């Protein structure tokens, strides 16, 4: 089950949170969800070169707050803040409410699953060998603190006639452990041969809930009680037991008392 289910949806109630954080009644839910999907698609195209990892949309009291996580915040803001003002105006036109845009910097882009997937797809579109791109991304992630990473590519890899799937893993990726912080993302590379899909799982350690607090490993002793050696606790030895280490137990060897051929006892 842990291998098939979406890692983020599997951990929503334990260690992950929603990307859209708002409440709506049955009449408005579909329209607001469609707005969120349109906003994410627009930001993905508009900020294609800004290395955007994720987008969080909140709707407090007839307003909208959009938080963009990017490893290159300067590209999003633009010269003297011109680009972000144009972005805010377009988002207000699309959503119909006042929009506040916040930019958060991703400190380690090499361990962000979405940025890893986007980087691999960009290399595939530039005709770089998929194995080289995948292994380089895995090495960078492990070097910067990831405890495990798994990358899967599927499609007409290297332009072959028959599509296939290849994946590589390094370290641990416990998909069925709920407290494990698994960052999962997908991306698509549109090549001349067709579409190649890329999936990335990054294991960053265990957490204690949605605040991303790391788990402190405690040293646990053996729970089994040790028996105190007492003089009368040992069971008595039976005949033939004991002796020097390596000594054979039991009776005499078979044929030990018989004389050898051609020899008789005197």
Curated annotation (Swiss-Prot):
Instruction: Name all KH type-2 domain ranges.
Output: 39-107
List the GO molecular function terms.
mRNA binding; rRNA binding; structural constituent of ribosome
Pfam families hit by this protein: KH_2, Ribosomal_S3_C
| Keywords for this protein | Ribonucleoprotein, Ribosomal protein, RNA-binding, rRNA-binding
**Record GO cellular component, one term:** cytosolic small ribosomal subunit
Q: Disulfide pairs?
A: none
Family classification: Belongs to the universal ribosomal protein uS3 family.
Assembly, in brief, is: Part of the 30S ribosomal subunit. Forms a tight complex with proteins S10 and S14.
Matches recorded under PANTHER family: 30S/40S RIBOSOMAL PROTEIN S3, SMALL RIBOSOMAL SUBUNIT PROTEIN US3C
Q: Identify this protein by name.
A: Small ribosomal subunit protein uS3
Q: Which organism is it from?
A: Burkholderia thailandensis (strain ATCC 700388 / DSM 13276 / CCUG 48851 / CIP 106301 / E264)
């Amino acid at each position: 089950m842990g291998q098939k289910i979406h890692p983020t949806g599997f951990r929503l109630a334990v260690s992950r949170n929603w990307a859209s954080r708002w409440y709506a009644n049955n009449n408005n839910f579909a329209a607001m969800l469609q707005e969120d999907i349109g906003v994410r698609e627009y930001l993905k195209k508009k900020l294609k070169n800004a290395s955007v990892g994720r987008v969080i949309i909140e709707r407090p009291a007839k307003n909208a707050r959009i938080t963009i996580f990017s490893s290159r915040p300067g590209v999003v803001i633009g010269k003297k803040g011109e680009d972000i003002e144009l972005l805010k105006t377009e988002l207000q036109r699309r959503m119909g409410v006042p929009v506040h845009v916040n930019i958060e910097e991703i400190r380690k882009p090499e361990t962000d699953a979405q940025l890893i997937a986007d980087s691999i797809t960009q290399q595939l579109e530039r005709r770089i060998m998929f194995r080289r791109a995948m292994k380089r991304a895995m090495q960078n992630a492990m070097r910067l603190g990831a405890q495990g990473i798994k990358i899967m590519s599927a499609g007409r890899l290297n332009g072959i006639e028959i599509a296939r799937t290849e994946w590589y893993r390094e370290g641990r990726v416990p998909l069925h452990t709920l407290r494990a912080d698994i960052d999962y993302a997908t991306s698509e590379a549109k090549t001349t041969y067709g579409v190649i899909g890329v999936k990335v799982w990054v294991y960053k350690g265990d957490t204690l809930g949605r605040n991303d607090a790391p788990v402190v490993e405690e040293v646990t002793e053996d729970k089994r009680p040790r028996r105190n050696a007492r003089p009368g606790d040992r069971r008595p030895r039976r005949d033939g037991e004991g002796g020097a280490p390596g000594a054979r137990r039991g009776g005499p060897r078979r044929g030990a008392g018989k004389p050898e051929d051609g020899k008789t006892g005197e």
